[in-house]
């Protein structure tokens, strides 16, 4: 995939904590603009920088009054499916750089309709350009909230239903 934010996790300015705090705050403003509850499901791949990125986003979202639910390590299609089925999240946030080098990482977003629209991307960019960081670096991480098991079970059940019976026997 090539959508979302991508770059070297250690050097790209848009993957550093200061920017990610602003991005988290911006996501909450975007949710409010869309009349959605600012509740976000975050998943990641196995890259070593994923938890740092996740925690910076969580701090920014919390600083703006939003809530994060952590799905842990999941493939992108699982996150998209859960966000669509649950319909309780303003967006899903996937921390991954897919097939890019291990030193890279990235962030992509989905809504309950799947990938966010071009209009959504433009709204986020506009809100981001107007946003400034204040004191969210000083805030502690909010209490970790895990993905409810039934939401993941629903995804796995859906996958199994696509397979011929006894394919995994």
Language-model-detected regions and their locations in the chain:
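Gly/Ser/Thr-enriched, mixed-charge loops and adjacent short helices
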Residues: 105-169
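Short, low-complexity, polar/charged sequence segments that are solvent-exposed and flexible
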Residues: 18-19, 59-63, 89, 112-115, ...
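Generic structural "secondary-structure junction" signal
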Residues: 2, 7, 11, 76, ...
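An N-terminal, well-structured beta->alpha segment
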Residues: 1-59, 63-64, 142-169
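Short, charged N-terminal helix-start/capping segments
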Residues: 1-3, 92, 96-107, 161-165
């Amino acid at each position: 995939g090539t959508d979302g934010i991508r770059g070297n996790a250690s050097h790209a300015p848009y993957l550093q904590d200061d920017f990610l705090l602003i991005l988290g705050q911006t996501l909450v403003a975007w949710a409010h603009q869309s009349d959605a509850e600012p509740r976000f499901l975050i998943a990641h791949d196995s890259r070593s920088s994923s938890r740092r990125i996740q925690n910076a986003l969580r701090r920014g979202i919390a600083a703006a009054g939003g809530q994060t639910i952590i799905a842990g390590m999941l493939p992108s299609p699982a996150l998209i499916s859960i966000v669509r089925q649950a319909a309780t999240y303003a967006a899903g946030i996937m921390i991954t750089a897919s097939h890019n080098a291990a030193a890279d990482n990235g962030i992509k977003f989905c809504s309950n309709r799947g990938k966010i629209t071009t209009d959504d991307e433009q709204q986020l960019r506009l809100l981001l350009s107007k946003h400034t960081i204040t004191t969210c670096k000083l805030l502690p991480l909010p209490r970790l909230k895990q993905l409810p098991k039934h939401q993941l079970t629903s995804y796995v059940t859906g996958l199994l239903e696509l397979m011929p019976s006894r394919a995994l026997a």
